[in-house]
From Swiss-Prot:
Top-rank taxon: Viruses
Annotated compartments: Membrane
Name of the protein: Uncharacterized protein L817
Species annotation: Acanthamoeba polyphaga mimivirus (APMV)
Transmembrane segment boundaries: 63-83, 109-129
Region annotation (Disordered) ranges: 1-22
Protein topology in the membrane: Multi-pass membrane protein
GO cellular component: membrane
Keyword tags: Membrane, Transmembrane, Transmembrane helix
Length: 142
């Protein structure tokens, strides 16, 4: 009877040797030095990778917001100009002239909006890039 108890405890100790910590230790022990150096190098760059992804996300969000502003302005600017030029109160002869004026003026206004948004976008990129590079250099020194 005591023999069966010893067999159970031996089997239990073998089961506990396959815990995740021991598997990780065995896996790490089986890796060569170059693989471990590569893993350590990648792990040391995780803050930079995280900051790079955050920078790219912010860039895409800004680009999307500016794209939406331009798309909305294609509908709002001509409507506002039609109201300002008095399209509803004009005669049928004048409606074509007003439509032509609205087409030309709204295109100029929209091009101006696009130009201002491009300036803001590139300025943001420049400022963020400088902050990103100097922030990385500051973290690299410390």
């Amino acid at each position: 009877m005591s023999g069966s108890v010893n067999q159970n405890t031996d089997q239990h100790s073998q089961d506990s040797s396959s815990t995740p910590n021991n598997k990780l230790t065995k896996t790490l022990a089986s890796l060569d030095d170059s693989t471990l150096e590569f893993a350590v190098d990648v792990l040391s760059h995780l803050p930079l990778i995280r900051r790079s992804l955050n920078y790219a996300k912010n860039l895409l969000v800004r680009l999307f917001v500016m794209y939406m502003i331009v798309q909305v302005s294609y509908y709002i600017v001509p409507f506002v100009l039609l109201v300002l030029f008095g399209y509803n109160q004009s005669t049928p002869d004048m409606k074509f002239a007003i439509q032509l004026q609205v087409l030309v003026v709204s295109r100029g206004i929209i091009d101006g909006i696009i130009g201002v948004l491009q300036f803001i976008f590139w300025f943001w990129i420049f400022v963020d890039l400088i902050r990103f590079l100097f922030g990385y250099a500051k973290n690299k020194v410390n």
